[in-house]
Amino acid sequence: MAITAQDINKLRQLTGAGMMDCKKALTEAQGDIDKAIELLRKKGQKIAAARAGRDTTEGFALADVNASADHGAIIALGCETDFVAKNDLFQQIAQQILSLALAQQPATIEDLKQLEIDGLTVQERITELVGKMGENITLSAYETLSAEVVVPYIHTGNKLAVLVALQGAKGEDVVVAGKDVAMQIAALNPIAIDKDGVFTSVIEQELAIAREQAIREGKPEAMLENIAQGRLNKFFKENTLANQPFVKDNTLTVAQYLTKIAAGLVVKNFKRVLVGA
């Protein structure tokens, strides 16, 4: 059976595969479109197996919320090169995965991989994409938050995405404030909302470092604990969101800024995803 340019174009539109791959698959399938699609899918699986384990330090991060803005999700689709990260099909699949995550609200990244997009699971769709792009592709991150108000932020270039969950008030001004706080999280990468959220092991490590530094500086032994505690407090101010100076007005902390927007407004939680991290 002769393979026509029309057949090749139809297969390309259905699969996104390259022209020569489509021609080869159609020839092997003797012009049967369905068999050709299956052959291309199997080729993708072979490429995926060969590429598995390669570092996916590039990629595309997305964040969004549902219609009521009380649930949000972040996904990151990882790949090997920035060239693939900028590919329209790659970004389209990432958007489909995010939309699916928001609609179905799976509990874990593994649950998300098993949900279906147009008859294929997310993982199968990614494997198919590997065959088309020719490099390792992974669903490298999936995070969700639910609260009274959830606000997304995507940094320019789609390498960094943030969700911030707010409680205590609603309204357009709260959403604007949430965007400001999300941008602060993107820029300064706090490790917790406040000191109560910092792991004990981190606190102990910071105290030990502060004591050692004070000893090297020749401080009296009787002053070591006070000095260490003072430096720990500085660490909290620099690394916990509520205590950080607000980037748009450093006369206020983030907590004070939110209180100024609405009494009782606080950050309930936040998520930050950096491609390749």
Swiss-Prot record:
Keywords from the named record: Cytoplasm, Elongation factor, Protein biosynthesis
Molecular function, one GO term: translation elongation factor activity
Record-given protein name: Elongation factor Ts
Source organism: Amoebophilus asiaticus (strain 5a2)
Location of region: Involved in Mg(2+) ion dislocation from EF-Tu: 81-84
UniProt cross-references to InterPro entries, sorted A to Z: EF-Ts_dimer_sf, Transl_elong_EFTs/EF1B, Transl_elong_EFTs/EF1B_dimer, Transl_elong_Ts_CS, UBA-like_sf
Gene: tsf
Family under the similarity heading: Belongs to the EF-Ts family.
GO CC terms of this entry: cytoplasm
Keyword Protein biosynthesis: yes
Keyword Protein biosynthesis: yes
Pfam families the record matches: EF_TS
Biological function: Associates with the EF-Tu.GDP complex and induces the exchange of GDP to GTP. It remains bound to the aminoacyl-tRNA.EF-Tu.GTP complex up to the GTP hydrolysis stage on the ribosome.
